[in-house]
Amino acid sequence: MRVRRGLLRLPRRSLLAALFFFSLSSSLLYFVYVAPGIVNTYLFMMQAQGILIRDNMRTIGAQVYEQVVRSAYAKRNSSVNDSDYPLDLNHSETFLQTTTFLPEDFTYFANHTCPERLPSMKGPIDINMSEIGMDTIHELFSKDPAIKLGGHWKPSDCVPRWKVAILIPFRNRHEHLPVLLRHLIPMLQRQRLQFAFYVVEQVGTQPFNRAMLFNVGFQEAMKDLDWDCLVFHDVDHIPENDRNYYGCGQMPRHFATKLDKYMYLLPYNEFFGGVSGLTVEQFRKINGFPNAFWGWGGEDDDLWNRVQNAGYSVSRPEGDTGKYKSIPYHHRGEVQFLGRYALLRKSKERQGLDGLNNLNYFANITYDALYKNITVNLTPELAQVTEY
């Protein structure tokens, strides 16, 4: 009798264990789906931690090797004239890096092109992440008559090297936008760039489509001015260094290379998210962003593929110039796009079919003192893709 009861208990325990693990895995998958930003942040942090450990091990190995070589030379040179065996393992450190930024007494000429490395660009910026109302931001910048309606500004003491449209995808981040503008407007003014802000806001019930918003913003921005440089800027990314020049170049630019929530390390080499820049010519050549990425994730990886497929490489700022702080919880509430990997495998085939050339939309345009607001209700029917 006891043996029978034991046999009956075993399946029950196994069933309970199976139900427990099923419930746990289902809860985990649901969390990954509804809170992808948090999950991916932790995954990127773990990946960055692995990179940091690997780099530290390389550094330790190099230091040990250097110490062994020094000891060997020291023993050898104890009986030989030191001048016969010069030891200079740190010869590269003897050369001081000379600054390429112009001196404080640099003279501007109104008919000359603004330089890229100006004395007003000091480097690290004091970051203030505290919340601030848009009314306060309006009051702060209303003292500058050079800022025109919609946030248009250009220098008066030199000819701007680049005319830059700053495109910001937006949904329910009203507390983040004034924090970004508080830092970005003064930085761009110090860089002597002509610029304007375009906040592209998605309404409706569809999942957030960051890439399609960028395409809409591009089309609307080009109606205002013959911009030659485009900066695609997440609203929660605050630059920490004003020497991170927001002009464009011969190759597409990835500005946000070191984000605080990723331990200031690049999560992976193909990472192209946060803040990026392309010339208008480059953006048109790659057919813009893809429109098919509904939900969080994948569109910046597809942009990387498009850039590579078009024969470009990606440039990045050196050292700590590309450091950014991230306003927390930007992606909370945005669902994970589970179909992104299937689309990424077909990036090359889709590039000529999905982007600027299949984009349709209806925009409601309003003007703020500091930006142009472009409101759109996006649906998949507005950017249908033919078979490929």
Swiss-Prot record:
Transmembrane segments: 15-35
Positions bound to N-acetyl-D-glucosamine: G298, E299, D300, D301, R340
UniProtKB keywords: Disulfide bond, Glycoprotein, Glycosyltransferase, Golgi apparatus, Lipid biosynthesis, Lipid metabolism, Manganese, Membrane, Metal-binding, Signal-anchor, Sphingolipid metabolism, Transferase, Transmembrane, Transmembrane helix
Annotated metabolic or biological route of this protein: Protein modification; protein glycosylation; Sphingolipid metabolism
GO biological process: carbohydrate metabolic process; central nervous system myelination; central nervous system neuron axonogenesis; ganglioside biosynthetic process via lactosylceramide; glycoprotein biosynthetic process; glycosylation; neuron maturation; poly-N-acetyllactosamine biosynthetic process
Catalytic reaction equation(s): a beta-D-glucosyl-(1<->1')-N-acylsphing-4-enine + UDP-alpha-D-galactose = a beta-D-Gal-(1->4)-beta-D-Glc-(1<->1)-Cer(d18:1(4E)) + UDP + H(+)
Keyword ATP-binding on entry: no
Expression triggers: (Microbial infection) Up-regulated in response to porcine reproductive and respiratory syndrome viral infection.
GO terms of molecular function: metal ion binding; N-acetyllactosamine synthase activity; UDP-galactose:glucosylceramide beta-1,4-galactosyltransferase activity
Glycosylation sites recorded in the entry for this protein: N77, N81, N90, N111, N128, N364, N373
Cysteines engaged in disulfide bonds, as pairs: C114-C158, C229-C248
Cofactors named for this entry: Mn(2+)
Major place of residence: Golgi
Binding-site list for Mn(2+): D236
Subunit record text: (Microbial infection) Interacts with porcine reproductive and respiratory syndrome virus GP5.
Reported function: Catalyzes the synthesis of lactosylceramide (LacCer) via the transfer of galactose from UDP-galactose to glucosylceramide (GlcCer). LacCer is the starting point in the biosynthesis of all gangliosides (membrane-bound glycosphingolipids) which play pivotal roles in the CNS including neuronal maturation and axonal and myelin formation. Plays a role in the glycosylation of BMPR1A and regulation of its protein stability. Essential for extraembryonic development during early embryogenesis. (Microbial infection) May play a role in the glycosylation of porcine reproductive and respiratory syndrome virus GP5 protein and may be involved in the regulation of viral proliferation.
Family: Belongs to the glycosyltransferase 7 family.
Name recorded for this polypeptide: Beta-1,4-galactosyltransferase 5
UniProt organism field: Sus scrofa
